[in-house]
């Protein structure tokens, strides 16, 4: 099986790809990672009989023949419960800006965090959702972390723990927090998402997903669809795993967060 990648970063690139699809029909199937299909795009794929498999696509999608995704709901529930068990009750979630005309897997991650925090509100949890300001061109991770840190430190009461949408952003955030004379994890705990190779090098606590296994499962689903074989479980979720390293710790109950 030969795989040809196409990189799409915004709605205009997505529209361009789908407008050219009927003319460049040199594929037997398509795997879409991390974002939601629009109804018109789904209809176009059906019209040209192109099997479509999603990897880490929003759960409410419904526009894929099959899918395999990390269980964001379970992951965020684990994250909130972990931080609560360490004594944290004021927790933030930090993410990049997502244009209104795109729906990414990380959009669902943000909502899953909010749902998990609300479910634990009776246990004293309060939370903040911090998102970068709107921007047309992608921000560097350093600039993104700088903006998110400014928002974090501008809150009426600084959170003692932060969940971050990806490891790359989390690592940049840790660096920026330390530039602002905050110790991680003594003053503020930081939890990433992915467990990318860089997370281990940075000693970052995170939530692990298995991208290679996600790809293998997606590939098997593609082959089954091409052979017209029935899929016993067309849509599957991968269980996340907490990985504890050196950016999360128990809060000092005697210390009040800086205002």
Residue ranges and their predicted role:
Residues 1-4, 29, 46-54, 58-259:
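Bacterial carbohydrate/catabolite-sensing allosteric modules
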Residues 38-46:
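Active-site-adjacent beta->alpha loops and helix N-cap segments on the catalytic face
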Residues 13, 42, 252:
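Short acidic, gly/pro-rich beta-turn/loop elements at beta-sheet edges
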Residues 37-39, 169-170:
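Glycine-rich nucleotide phosphate-binding loop and flanking beta-alpha elements
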Residues 1-37, 57:
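Central regulatory/effector-binding core of bacterial HTH transcription factors
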